[in-house]
Amino acid sequence: MKKLNTLFLTAGMLASLTAQAQLRVEISGVGSNQIPVAVAAFVDEGQSPTQISKVIKTDLERSGAFKVIDAGTISDINSVDAASYKARGADALVVGTVQKQPNGTYDVRYKLMSTIQNAKISQLDQQAPAQFTRLSAHKIADDVYEKLTGVRGIFATRIAYVTQQGRSYRLEVADADGENVQLALSSNEPIISPSWSPDGTKVAYVSFEQKKPVIYVQNLITRQRTVIANERGSNSAPSWSPDGSRIALALSKTGNTQVYIANSSGGGIRRISNSSGIDTEPQFSADGQSIYFTSDRSGGPQIYRMSANGGDAQRVTFKGNYNISPRISSDGKSLAYISRRNGNFQLYVMDLASGQELRLSDNTNDQAPSFAPNGKYILYSTESGGRKALAVVSVDGRVKQRLTIQAGAIKEPTWGPFMK
């Protein structure tokens, strides 16, 4: 309950920010082995501002991992013959209740039943203020996803991105499904390269509001901002260490852009790369011991890895003559990046152990990949119908989503961490 309260508190303070453009989500493709799961309408969910069962169904369908079956309404969740739903093709059954409390909060309870064993697999009881009943539904979907796949769900996580309409730039935060959009920063100058802190309470980004690129860290709860780098020349590409204590960045203060490390509270800037080329787009490895970055030291942009303390670098990408924007999965096993092949900039993912790569996009102008915290999906910017849009693809390439807004461009996405 303590963790859930922390999540509610963080989201609640964010909710005080101004909501603006709503994302629209389009889904295509399905997983290779979908799990059939029946979801019943929650008892008395009409009392809640959120139709809990609808959010759960949408989350599970959006993942591509489940075939959702409408179980109708089950009025007594303590006396359910789950086995009877096996005949309807379901391997599992989701049931629940919603009850409004005298203090105005909502008691949201759910059970996950095995139709094969006719037994309870999991349950979750939550007390949620009205504005967070939707978050409660996401947490239930996360629990269903984890119990049935063995992988932690990402429906209660958030994403950050930049929208542009004319000369108006907005750094926005939304739920992973594009709902509940909140404004973090608005500017008449470009905002680029947002990067979540590991605890999900801060975002580092580059703002041109001082008529030059400057790196800031903004607390999403208090909105307090700290300047991390305002050196001579370009200050760009901030990226957090896994423990949140350091930020890798790219600075050009001595000439060619090189990789540096700074304290996440500001100060302590020290150089860790030293090449005659351009070294940029640094990303910490999952264990924080290495830095992946883009360098043209071999004559064209390729992805390299070096110690987080600096030193010699090893080249990681060899296929294609233009590979940029490295991003590492949370388990450290996969590398996502953008590769130019036949004139197209497309999203690829590489198994770092085998070096085997897979193209995940059929578009021609992909940018800024970002792994979901469970490593099963990648969020990136692309171009659709001549407009900038966001897309999500599963790491096997089977499930795809596209997120658009009604007007303007949406770009520079980054997927937030699991909330603690």
Predicted segments with their positions:
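N-terminal signal peptide c-region/cleavage motif recognized by signal peptidases
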Residues: S16-T18
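Amphipathic beta-strand/beta-sheet edge segments enriched in Tyr/Trp
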Residues: L23, N78-D143
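Short beta-strand->alpha-helix linker/helix-N-cap micro-motif
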Residues: R24-Y85, V94
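Structural motif
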Residues: G104-D107, R167-E172, K212-Y216, N256-Y260, ...
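Hydrophobic beta-strand positions that form the internal "hydrophobic ladder"
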Residues: I159, G200-V203, G244-A248, G288-I291, ...
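Multi-bladed beta-propeller domains
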Residues: D175-P190, Q218-S236, A262-T280, M306-Y322, ...
